């Protein structure tokens, strides 16, 4: 969302402010469908026995219950403060500061983790307590530029979750979170679209889906052999560029 808000500062979408606020959230459903596509086998809680009889996968059901627990803190904070955040913090400067701050956090935490062995190696090792703690970190993502996935991954790394398990649980969390946020934004917008607005939403979702398929596959392959420091440096550089631009030209 932070990236989209920044792009809108330079190439503004020709639409009402209310529609853009809804659009920046709802098109991320395309990214969520990409997550479901890639992680279908892990996310779908049923499997066929002898190709005819469906059998429940207990580990998958358990992971979804943990996901619900992790979503509770963020849901409460979003309902209480979403309007305030939209009105006061959706600015390029706030986004840039958040980019830099959490970029530094990624680098510091990865350096600290060099001497630590993860306590939680796999997705199924995540407990309800761990899930709730990760959910508390997800609350930070209500600040534009923080990155929901960045906040949850940083939180997971801090409490001893491996990189791969942290990323996978973040993707689990994304499904109910983004569906919930999208529903909230659409209800606030009024569920009334012009044909042009509807077309913009569909195109945005399709593009988000296609790009996300490539990015998620790359990310999961990359973190099996590397840490997150490169993403930290990227955030810092982008944040500095944005601050410099608005200091000089705004």
Where are these regions (language model features)?
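Multi-pass membrane proteins that catalyze or facilitate reactions on polyprenyl-/lipid-phosphate substrates
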Residues: 1-250
């Amino acid at each position: 969302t932070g990236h989209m808000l920044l792009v809108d500062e330079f190439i503004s979408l020709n639409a009402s402010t209310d529609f853009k606020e809804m659009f920046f959230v709802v098109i991320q459903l395309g990214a969520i469908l990409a997550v479901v596509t890639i992680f279908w086998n892990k996310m779908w809680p049923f499997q066929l026995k002898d190709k005819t009889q469906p059998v429940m996968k207990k580990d998958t059901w358990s992971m979804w219950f943990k996901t619900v627990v992790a979503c509770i803190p963020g849901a409460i904070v979003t309902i209480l403060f979403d309007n305030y955040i939209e009105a006061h913090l959706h600015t390029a400067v706030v986004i840039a500061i958040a980019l830099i701050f959490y970029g530094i956090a990624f680098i510091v935490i990865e350096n600290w983790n060099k001497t630590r062995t993860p306590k939680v190696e796999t997705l199924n090792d995540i407990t309800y307590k761990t899930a709730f703690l990760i959910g508390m970190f997800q609350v930070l993502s209500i600040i534009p530029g923080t990155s929901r996935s960045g906040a949850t991954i940083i939180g997971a790394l801090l409490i001893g979750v491996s990189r791969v398990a942290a990323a996978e649980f973040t993707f689990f969390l994304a499904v109910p979170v983004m569906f919930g946020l999208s529903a909230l934004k659409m209800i606030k917008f009024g569920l009334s679209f012009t044909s042009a607005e509807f077309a913009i939403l569909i195109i945005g979702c399709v593009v988000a889906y296609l790009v996300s398929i490539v990015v998620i596959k790359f990310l999961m392959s990359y973190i099996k052999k590397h840490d997150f420091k490169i993403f930290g440096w990227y955030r810092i550089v982008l944040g500095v560029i944005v601050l410099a631009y608005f200091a000089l030209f705004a």
